[in-house]
């Protein structure tokens, strides 16, 4: 079986079929298995299945249009109160939540679901109205939004390996 990392690709069109509760739990477990700075695990996950809410989120940014077809979005949020004093102002939670996002997307591929990463933070026009819509406390920031569903399109993953981007020992 080919490595799931190389099978993953962005899927923006979905059948509309719901993602099962078991699949959602598996996706969330994968997200929580991600590494995090000092093992703080600053993430919180908002599972969005409500059609009206998905449609509203799709209007927050030009790159969120696929949510109009998606049966599910997982909003990966950071609890900024979990930032340790030694980390203050460094926002390691961005990296931590990004790792969780990648894990969820890889797990989606393994489950034969399609997904696409929708950049949320630091775009104020995206993350501020999303935080308000979802009723997030002030210390919780939506970092990424993942659109997830059963793919209605077949997309061949691209080979992105580029030897020109490799540097050993020195630039």
Stretches found by the model and what they are:
Residues 1-171:
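Acidic, surface-exposed loops and disordered segments
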